[in-house]
Amino acid sequence: MPRLHDHVWSYPSAGAARPYSLPRGMIAAALCPQGPGAPEPEPAPRGQREGTAGFSARPGSWHHDLVQRSLVLFSFGVVLALVLNLLQIQRNVTLFPDEVIATIFSSAWWVPPCCGTAAAVVGLLYPCIDSHLGEPHKFKREWASVMRCIAVFVGINHASAKLDFANNVQLSLTLAALSLGLWWTFDRSRSGLGLGITIAFLATLITQFLVYNGVYQYTSPDFLYIRSWLPCIFFSGGVTVGNIGRQLAMGVPEKPHSD
């Protein structure tokens, strides 16, 4: 007669079927207590929460911040254009023909909006180029430095209208040195130098086109109907607006990318 322990401790043969075992996930779910008294599951890590719930909130926040920065830069460009144009008119540097004043271009109402739009484009372009090149600008990133840069730029523009040199070549070389000094003091980035030169070239071309078509004119033009020092003003203005755009972009989350 077989004994009980022979059946209990007998090892199954190779051909015998192995007992079925539940998956670990089902076992864990069965062992976890359910009901109102059960402990709440641990929250997911912060990175995972930002990757799911934050993904849908970031695009709207990014676009909202973009609009805010555009409005700030546009307002700055409008105010700066009014101030600098007033300095130029006081020194009798810029003259508007009578036939232009009598038309819709009276008091040059179109100049401040154009300068504001250009300031918004340039101010948004600088941090975008930095992000694209993978070289974030970290040199003197504080508002005090930005305000000093604005003051130096206004001083350069005021000097272009007030200082009297023996000839315009000396004035142009002096302003070019001051503009490069402004870039070296407040920027020192290759992208800032390249964008400043590009802005100076394009803005001078547009100004030459407007002067050539009689929209306005300069007293004593010395280089293709315009002042030869004008590219220096555009260069230093581009660097100044770029610093403002970079400062406004600090702490702004990057544009979300959809995989």
Swiss-Prot record:
Q: Which GO terms describe its biological process?
A: cellular response to insulin stimulus; cellular response to sterol; cholesterol biosynthetic process; cholesterol homeostasis; cholesterol metabolic process; cranial suture morphogenesis; inner ear morphogenesis; middle ear morphogenesis
Give residues where Phosphoserine occurs. Answer: 189
Subcellular location per UniProt equals: Endoplasmic reticulum membrane
Membrane topology, record value: Multi-pass membrane protein
Query: Subunit comment for this entry?
Result: Interacts with SCAP; interaction is direct and only takes place in the presence of sterols; it prevents interaction between SCAP and the coat protein complex II (COPII). Associates with the SCAP-SREBP complex (composed of SCAP and SREBF1/SREBP1 or SREBF2/SREBP2); association is mediated via its interaction with SCAP and only takes place in the presence of sterols. Interaction with SCAP is mutually exclusive with PAQR3.
Role according to the record? Oxysterol-binding protein that mediates feedback control of cholesterol synthesis by controlling both endoplasmic reticulum to Golgi transport of SCAP and degradation of HMGCR. Acts as a negative regulator of cholesterol biosynthesis by mediating the retention of the SCAP-SREBP complex in the endoplasmic reticulum, thereby blocking the processing of sterol regulatory element-binding proteins (SREBPs) SREBF1/SREBP1 and SREBF2/SREBP2. Binds oxysterol, including 25-hydroxycholesterol, regulating interaction with SCAP and retention of the SCAP-SREBP complex in the endoplasmic reticulum.
- InterPro entries assigned to the protein according to its UniProt record, in alphabetical order: INSIG_fam
Q: Which residues cross the membrane?
A: 67-89, 109-126, 142-164, 168-186, 192-213, 228-245
Single Gene Ontology MF annotation: protein sequestering activity
Which family is this protein grouped under? Belongs to the INSIG family.
Q: What is known of its domains?
A: The KxHxx motif mediates association with the coatomer complex.
Q: Which organism is it from?
A: Rattus norvegicus (Rat)
Q: Where is this region: Disordered?
A: 33-57
The record's account of how the chain is modified after translation: Phosphorylation at Ser-189 by PCK1 reduces binding to oxysterol, disrupting the interaction between INSIG1 and SCAP, thereby promoting nuclear translocation of SREBP proteins (SREBF1/SREBP1 or SREBF2/SREBP2) and subsequent transcription of downstream lipogenesis-related genes. Ubiquitinated by AMFR/gp78 in response to sterol deprivation, leading to its degradation: when the SCAP-SREBP complex becomes dissociated from INSIG1, INSIG1 is then ubiquitinated and degraded in proteasomes. Although ubiquitination is required for rapid INSIG1 degradation, it is not required for release of the SCAP-SREBP complex. Ubiquitinated by RNF139.
Report the PANTHER family cross-referenced here: INSULIN-INDUCED GENE 1, INSULIN-INDUCED GENE 1 PROTEIN
Keyword annotations of the record = Cholesterol metabolism, Endoplasmic reticulum, Isopeptide bond, Lipid metabolism, Lipid-binding, Membrane, Phosphoprotein, Steroid metabolism, Sterol metabolism, Transmembrane, Transmembrane helix, Ubl conjugation
Q: Which residues lie on this side of the membrane: Cytoplasmic?
A: 1-66, 127-141, 187-191, 246-259
What inducers act on this gene? By insulin and hepatectomy.
**Residue(s) at site: Required for the recognition of 25-hydroxycholesterol:** 153
Q: Where is this motif: KxHxx?
A: 253-259
Designated name of the protein: Insulin-induced gene 1 protein
Instruction: List, alphabetically, the GO terms of the cellular component aspect.
Output: endoplasmic reticulum; endoplasmic reticulum membrane; SREBP-SCAP-Insig complex
**Segments on the Extracellular face:** 90-108, 165-167, 214-227
Q: Where is this cross-link: Glycyl lysine isopeptide (Lys-Gly) (interchain with G-Cter in ubiquitin)?
A: 138, 140
**Record has Hydrolase as a keyword:** no
